[in-house]
């Protein structure tokens, strides 16, 4: 957490250079409730078997089921594996993919995604495969901080990663196979996200991708990508929405493709203190009807 705060303070002089988007009055955000201390570092959200889940971002990996009406923890599952900086969980029909690829300073050489079969999870057999990877173009020095990553989604036979670029305030999309092994990620495209991308939610039925993030002042934003050709998100129609409620937004999930849940990490700096929270937002008025 302190590393993130330090980087934010370092980037404050760049604020006048950042592109601005417009906050919309009809963007309805509902604060569900505060999150418990066990998940105040929440970095991801996902639905599984009708329940909303998050997990801790380091140490012994545990899953926490959250009550969607209160944000309270309903149950806890200890997966028996340690993670260094877990930032995202995505899934397909058969597997969960745990993204241990957080890298604030761009120095890690052990980036990986842990794969767990849903059938094993339900049987309480926690056997993980590993998808290890590196970036083909990772910079050195301060620019290495453009290779942090907190957003990933599974589509077809691939995993799509969106970097969190502390220096350029943009994001680059990379792709990996979903099968265990060691890979060099393939670079697809770069786009100006107007801030730090921290979560991804792909709607398979409507072929829509929603990215979550926050800008240099910690204001959350959403980037909706639609009308793209196949998996070429670079050609998508993009709409960026500012969210007036909350700070450092970290995880996003939807069960129906209309109402989205997202989380805010706990934040404390000088005289500013914010508890971790679960929020809910209705995006029906901002997405194309399919």
Label each residue range with its predicted role:
Residues 1-26:
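Bacterial Sec-dependent N-terminal signal peptides
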Residues 20-290:
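Sequence/structural signature of beta-propeller domains
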């Amino acid at each position: 957490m302190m590393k993130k705060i330090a980087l934010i303070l370092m980037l404050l002089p760049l604020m006048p250079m950042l592109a601005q988007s417009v906050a919309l009055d009809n963007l309805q955000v509902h604060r569900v409730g505060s999150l418990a201390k066990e998940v105040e570092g929440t970095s991801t959200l996902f639905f599984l078997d009708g329940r909303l889940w998050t997990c801790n971002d380091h140490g012994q990996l545990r899953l926490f089921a959250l009550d969607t009406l209160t944000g309270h923890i309903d149950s806890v599952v200890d997966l028996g594996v340690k993670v260094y900086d877990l930032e995202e969980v995505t899934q397909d029909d058969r597997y969960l993919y745990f993204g241990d690829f957080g890298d604030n300073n761009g120095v890690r050489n052990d980036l990986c995604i842990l794969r767990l079969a849903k059938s094993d999870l339900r049987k309480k057999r926690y056997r993980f495969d590993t998808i290890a990877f590196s970036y083909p173009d990772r910079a050195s020095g301060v620019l290495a901080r453009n290779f942090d990553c907190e957003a990933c989604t599974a589509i077809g036979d691939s995993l799509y990663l969106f970097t969190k670029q502390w220096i350029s305030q943009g994001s680059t999309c990379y792709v990996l196979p979903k099968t265990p092994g060691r890979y060099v990620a393939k670079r697809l495209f770069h786009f100006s996200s107007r801030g730090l991308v921290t979560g991804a939610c792909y709607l398979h039925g409507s072929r829509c991708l929603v990215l979550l993030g926050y800008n240099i002042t910690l204001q959350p934003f959403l980037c909706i990508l639609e009308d793209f050709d196949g998996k070429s998100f670079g050609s998508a129609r993009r709409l960026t929405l500012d969210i007036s409620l909350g700070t450092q937004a970290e995880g996003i999930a939807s069960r129906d493709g209309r109402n989205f849940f997202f989380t805010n990490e706990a934040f404390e700096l000088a005289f500013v203190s914010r508890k971790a929270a679960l929020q809910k937002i209705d995006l029906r008025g901002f997405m194309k009807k399919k």
